Amino acid sequence: EHPYTDEKNPEEVFLLPRNKEVAKQLAEESIVLLKNRDAILPLSADARISFAGELGKSNGNLCGNWPCCGLPSDNAPLLETLKQSFHHLSESSADSDIVICCIGQESDKTGENHSFSNIDLPSDQVAMVRELKSRGKKIVALLMNGRPLALGEVEPYCDAILEVWRLGTMASEAIVATLSGESNPSGKLAMTFPYSSGQIPVYYNRRPRSRQGTQGFYE
Protein backbone atom coordinates (compact mmCIF):
# COMPACT_ATOMS: atom_id res chain seq x y z
CA GLU A 1 0.00 0.00 0.00
CA HIS A 2 1.03 3.59 -0.68
CA PRO A 3 -1.35 5.79 1.35
CA TYR A 4 0.70 8.98 1.07
CA THR A 5 1.18 11.31 -1.87
CA ASP A 6 4.66 11.84 -3.23
CA GLU A 7 5.31 15.42 -2.17
CA LYS A 8 7.69 15.84 -5.09
CA ASN A 9 4.92 15.27 -7.64
CA PRO A 10 1.77 17.05 -6.41
CA GLU A 11 0.58 17.60 -9.99
CA GLU A 12 -0.16 13.87 -10.18
CA VAL A 13 -2.83 14.25 -7.48
CA PHE A 14 -3.97 17.86 -7.11
CA LEU A 15 -6.20 19.80 -9.50
CA LEU A 16 -6.77 16.89 -11.85
CA PRO A 17 -9.69 17.41 -14.27
CA ARG A 18 -11.78 14.73 -12.58
CA ASN A 19 -11.20 16.31 -9.17
CA LYS A 20 -12.09 19.78 -10.43
CA GLU A 21 -15.29 18.43 -11.94
CA VAL A 22 -16.32 17.03 -8.55
CA ALA A 23 -15.36 20.32 -6.88
CA LYS A 24 -17.55 22.21 -9.36
CA GLN A 25 -20.50 19.89 -8.74
CA LEU A 26 -20.19 20.28 -4.96
CA ALA A 27 -19.93 24.06 -5.31
CA GLU A 28 -23.02 24.21 -7.53
CA GLU A 29 -25.04 22.11 -5.10
CA SER A 30 -24.04 24.42 -2.22
CA ILE A 31 -25.44 27.62 -3.77
CA VAL A 32 -28.74 28.77 -2.25
CA LEU A 33 -31.30 30.93 -4.04
CA LEU A 34 -32.64 33.36 -1.42
CA LYS A 35 -34.63 35.63 -3.73
CA ASN A 36 -35.63 35.75 -7.40
CA ARG A 37 -38.08 38.59 -8.03
CA ASP A 38 -39.91 38.33 -11.37
CA ALA A 39 -37.72 35.34 -12.27
CA ILE A 40 -34.77 37.56 -13.19
CA LEU A 41 -32.55 34.47 -12.92
CA PRO A 42 -31.24 32.80 -14.95
CA LEU A 43 -29.62 35.60 -16.91
CA SER A 44 -29.59 35.67 -20.69
CA ALA A 45 -26.20 35.47 -22.38
CA ASP A 46 -27.11 38.66 -24.26
CA ALA A 47 -28.21 40.62 -21.18
CA ARG A 48 -26.53 43.99 -20.58
CA ILE A 49 -24.73 43.26 -17.32
CA SER A 50 -22.17 45.02 -15.17
CA PHE A 51 -20.13 43.90 -12.18
CA ALA A 52 -19.69 45.68 -8.84
CA GLY A 53 -18.18 44.90 -5.45
CA GLU A 54 -14.58 44.52 -4.34
CA LEU A 55 -15.27 41.13 -2.72
CA GLY A 56 -15.70 39.53 -6.12
CA LYS A 57 -12.31 40.76 -7.33
CA SER A 58 -10.34 38.71 -4.80
CA ASN A 59 -9.66 35.03 -5.39
CA GLY A 60 -8.99 34.69 -1.67
CA ASN A 61 -12.63 35.42 -0.91
CA LEU A 62 -13.65 32.62 -3.26
CA CYS A 63 -11.37 30.11 -1.50
CA GLY A 64 -12.47 30.93 2.02
CA ASN A 65 -10.57 31.06 5.29
CA TRP A 66 -9.70 27.34 5.40
CA PRO A 67 -8.21 26.60 1.95
CA CYS A 68 -5.48 24.40 3.49
CA CYS A 69 -3.17 23.67 0.56
CA GLY A 70 -5.38 25.50 -1.89
CA LEU A 71 -3.98 28.70 -3.36
CA PRO A 72 -5.97 31.73 -4.51
CA SER A 73 -4.05 31.48 -7.78
CA ASP A 74 -5.73 28.10 -8.38
CA ASN A 75 -9.06 29.91 -8.77
CA ALA A 76 -10.24 31.43 -12.02
CA PRO A 77 -11.07 35.13 -11.42
CA LEU A 78 -14.82 35.61 -11.14
CA LEU A 79 -14.93 38.65 -13.43
CA GLU A 80 -13.03 36.88 -16.22
CA THR A 81 -15.24 33.81 -15.93
CA LEU A 82 -18.34 35.99 -16.15
CA LYS A 83 -17.03 37.61 -19.34
CA GLN A 84 -16.74 34.20 -20.99
CA SER A 85 -20.47 33.52 -20.57
CA PHE A 86 -21.98 37.00 -20.72
CA HIS A 87 -20.81 38.74 -23.86
CA HIS A 88 -22.10 42.21 -22.96
CA LEU A 89 -20.63 42.37 -19.46
CA SER A 90 -19.16 45.73 -18.49
CA GLU A 91 -17.44 47.06 -15.40
CA SER A 92 -19.43 50.30 -15.78
CA SER A 93 -23.00 50.24 -14.52
CA ALA A 94 -23.86 53.08 -16.92
CA ASP A 95 -23.83 50.59 -19.79
CA SER A 96 -25.98 47.93 -18.12
CA ASP A 97 -29.52 47.04 -17.14
CA ILE A 98 -28.51 44.45 -14.54
CA VAL A 99 -25.72 44.72 -11.97
CA ILE A 100 -24.13 41.69 -10.35
CA CYS A 101 -23.15 42.94 -6.87
CA CYS A 102 -20.75 41.00 -4.66
CA ILE A 103 -21.59 41.65 -1.01
CA GLY A 104 -20.75 39.98 2.29
CA GLN A 105 -17.56 39.67 4.33
CA GLU A 106 -13.90 39.11 3.50
CA SER A 107 -12.73 35.56 4.08
CA ASP A 108 -10.41 36.58 6.94
CA LYS A 109 -13.41 37.76 8.98
CA THR A 110 -14.77 34.24 9.49
CA GLY A 111 -13.45 31.21 11.33
CA GLU A 112 -12.04 30.77 14.80
CA ASN A 113 -11.56 33.89 16.92
CA HIS A 114 -13.57 36.06 14.54
CA SER A 115 -16.84 36.55 16.39
CA PHE A 116 -19.01 39.59 15.62
CA SER A 117 -21.74 41.21 17.69
CA ASN A 118 -22.88 43.13 14.61
CA ILE A 119 -23.59 41.01 11.54
CA ASP A 120 -24.99 43.80 9.38
CA LEU A 121 -23.41 44.30 5.97
CA PRO A 122 -20.68 46.96 5.78
CA SER A 123 -22.10 50.44 5.23
CA ASP A 124 -20.25 50.93 1.94
CA GLN A 125 -21.89 47.82 0.50
CA VAL A 126 -25.33 48.96 1.61
CA ALA A 127 -24.69 52.37 0.01
CA MET A 128 -23.51 50.72 -3.21
CA VAL A 129 -26.64 48.59 -3.57
CA ARG A 130 -28.97 51.50 -2.81
CA GLU A 131 -27.17 53.85 -5.19
CA LEU A 132 -27.31 51.35 -8.06
CA LYS A 133 -30.99 50.73 -7.41
CA SER A 134 -31.67 54.47 -7.43
CA ARG A 135 -30.32 54.53 -10.99
CA GLY A 136 -32.98 52.06 -12.06
CA LYS A 137 -30.73 49.00 -12.21
CA LYS A 138 -31.84 45.48 -11.45
CA ILE A 139 -29.63 44.03 -8.73
CA VAL A 140 -28.42 40.43 -8.57
CA ALA A 141 -26.53 40.07 -5.28
CA LEU A 142 -23.90 37.39 -4.74
CA LEU A 143 -23.58 36.88 -0.98
CA MET A 144 -20.05 35.81 -0.02
CA ASN A 145 -19.79 34.89 3.64
CA GLY A 146 -19.00 32.21 6.16
CA ARG A 147 -21.71 33.08 8.70
CA PRO A 148 -25.33 34.28 8.67
CA LEU A 149 -25.56 37.98 7.86
CA ALA A 150 -28.40 40.42 8.44
CA LEU A 151 -29.70 41.46 5.02
CA GLY A 152 -32.57 43.72 6.07
CA GLU A 153 -30.87 46.89 4.78
CA VAL A 154 -30.32 45.58 1.24
CA GLU A 155 -32.89 42.83 0.62
CA PRO A 156 -35.68 45.22 -0.53
CA TYR A 157 -33.32 46.68 -3.16
CA CYS A 158 -32.17 43.33 -4.56
CA ASP A 159 -34.06 41.60 -7.36
CA ALA A 160 -32.19 38.35 -6.75
CA ILE A 161 -29.91 37.08 -3.99
CA LEU A 162 -27.66 34.05 -4.34
CA GLU A 163 -25.88 32.73 -1.26
CA VAL A 164 -22.55 31.58 -2.67
CA TRP A 165 -20.56 31.08 0.56
CA ARG A 166 -16.87 30.20 0.04
CA LEU A 167 -17.02 27.63 -2.73
CA GLY A 168 -13.37 26.72 -3.17
CA THR A 169 -11.32 26.05 -6.27
CA MET A 170 -14.21 25.96 -8.74
CA ALA A 171 -16.18 28.83 -7.21
CA SER A 172 -16.20 31.09 -10.26
CA GLU A 173 -17.29 28.34 -12.62
CA ALA A 174 -20.08 27.23 -10.27
CA ILE A 175 -21.38 30.78 -9.77
CA VAL A 176 -21.44 31.50 -13.50
CA ALA A 177 -23.13 28.16 -14.23
CA THR A 178 -25.86 29.10 -11.75
CA LEU A 179 -26.32 32.64 -13.06
CA SER A 180 -26.61 31.36 -16.63
CA GLY A 181 -29.07 28.58 -15.81
CA GLU A 182 -26.70 25.73 -16.58
CA SER A 183 -26.99 24.71 -12.92
CA ASN A 184 -30.05 24.87 -10.66
CA PRO A 185 -29.39 26.50 -7.25
CA SER A 186 -30.79 23.64 -5.19
CA GLY A 187 -28.92 24.24 -1.92
CA LYS A 188 -30.68 24.88 1.39
CA LEU A 189 -29.68 27.07 4.32
CA ALA A 190 -28.26 25.17 7.26
CA MET A 191 -28.97 28.02 9.67
CA THR A 192 -31.38 30.92 10.24
CA PHE A 193 -30.51 34.36 8.89
CA PRO A 194 -31.81 37.16 11.16
CA TYR A 195 -33.33 40.30 9.66
CA SER A 196 -31.13 42.50 11.86
CA SER A 197 -28.29 42.22 14.35
CA GLY A 198 -30.75 43.17 17.09
CA GLN A 199 -32.24 39.68 16.92
CA ILE A 200 -29.06 37.97 18.08
CA PRO A 201 -28.27 35.93 20.06
CA VAL A 202 -30.87 33.53 18.66
CA TYR A 203 -31.77 30.57 20.89
CA TYR A 204 -33.35 27.41 19.58
CA ASN A 205 -34.13 25.78 22.93
CA ARG A 206 -36.37 28.45 24.46
CA ARG A 207 -39.18 30.80 23.56
CA PRO A 208 -38.26 34.43 22.83
CA ARG A 209 -39.35 36.97 25.47
CA SER A 210 -39.32 40.75 25.53
CA ARG A 211 -38.92 40.96 29.32
CA GLN A 212 -35.52 40.77 30.91
CA GLY A 213 -34.72 38.58 33.87
CA THR A 214 -36.82 35.56 32.94
CA GLN A 215 -36.23 32.95 30.29
CA GLY A 216 -38.86 31.32 28.09
CA PHE A 217 -37.83 27.71 28.56
CA TYR A 218 -39.88 24.93 27.01
CA GLU A 219 -41.42 22.51 29.50
In which residue ranges do the predicted regions lie?
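Short, surface-exposed polybasic-aromatic patches that bind anionic ligands, especially phosphate groups
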Residues: 1
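C-terminal non-catalytic regions of proteins with extracellular/luminal or membrane-system context
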Residues: 5-219
